[in-house]
Design a protein with these regions (language model features):
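Basic, flexible linker segments flanking DNA-binding modules
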Residues: 1, 36-95
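Acidic/histidine-rich, metal-coordinating catalytic segments
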Residues: 154-169, 187
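Short conserved beta-strand segments at catalytic cores or DNA/RNA-binding microdomains
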Residues: 95, 108, 112-129
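Active-site beta-loop-alpha junctions of metal-dependent nucleic acid enzymes
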Residues: 109-113, 130-153
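Charged alpha-helix within mobile-element recombinases
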Residues: 7-19, 29-30, 150, 174-245
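Two-metal-ion RNase H-like nuclease active-site motif
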Residues: 100-110
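Mobile genetic element proteins and their domesticated derivatives, centered on retroelements
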Residues: 13, 26, 43, 106, ...
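DNA-recognition alpha helix
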Residues: 23-35
């Protein structure tokens, strides 16, 4: 027999789905924080019924979004990164994920390449920092990265990034944070797949062609907080914030 959802439980489910949690994450959250045992198939069934009634709650499911792919043209990434150290020289401990403090960095470019976000993701906890960039100039990216990570300086050992020109002043980051920077092999973006995946989650909130100049810092912080307070299956349904902070 299908589980009968009462109005209070439905309110909980609606709130969590609107926060972009998957049905599996909703079940884990309800079990952990409200001692409610529910199977994710029950939530999918509820969402299907809700959709047939004309509701749009189902649109908050991540399955509705196309996979994120970085698409701002290879011309921006051409050239040789000054003082580049390749990922093949990165310490083995980074891949072992046995410590907190190894980060991946990337950018999400807005409409017409006129605006962008810098995204920083810690590899073990999935803790995410999102910053609005004034431009894609290397000096702006370096300044934003230092400003974002300075408060966590004792937990910044390495930062892995791609070969985009926006990261050409990575030595400023290294000097300010006393951390090492490493670069993926050209066209091997999967070597920092965690950040690529996180950017896909961020694109749920800010679709392609978003002009980030029109997005407030408060809104960006709201998205950052939602991601960091979302229970993750890979973390045993714990949240990045709890594990990192």
């Amino acid at each position: 027999q299908p589980y009968k959802l009462d109005s209070q439980l439905i309110q909980h489910i609606d709130t969590l789905i609107r926060r972009k949690l998957s049905p599996e994450q909703v079940c884990a959250y309800l079990c952990k924080h409200h001692q409610i045992t529910l199977h994710h198939s029950t939530i999918y069934r509820y969402l299907r019924q809700d959709k047939s009634n004309g509701s749009t709650l189902w649109q908050h499911l991540r399955i509705c979004s196309k996979p994120y792919r970085k698409r701002y043209g290879s011309t921006w990434t051409r050239g040789k990164v000054p003082n580049r150290v390749g990922i093949e020289n990165r310490p083995a401990i980074v891949d072992q994920k046995s410590r907190i403090g190894d980060w991946e960095a990337d950018t999400i470019v807005g409409k017409g390449q006129k605006s962008a976000l810098l995204t920083l993701v810690e590899r073990v906890t999935r803790y995410t920092i999102i910053c609005k960039l004034d431009s894609l100039k290397a000096e702006d990216t370096a300044r934003a990265a230092v400003r974002a990570l300075k408060a966590h300086k004792d937990r910044v050992h390495t930062i892995t990034m791609d070969n985009g020109k926006e990261f050409y002043q990575h030595t400023k980051i290294t000097k300010a944070l006393k951390a090492e920077t490493y670069f993926c092999r050209p066209y091997h973006s999967w070597e920092k797949g965690l950040n690529e995946n996180t950017n896909g989650l961020i694109r749920q909130y800010f679709p392609k062609q978003t002009d980030f100049r029109n997005i407030s810092d408060r809104e960006i912080r709201r998205v950052q907080d939602e991601l960091n307070h979302r229970p993750r299956k890979t973390l045993g349904y714990e949240t990045p914030s709890v594990l990192f902070l």
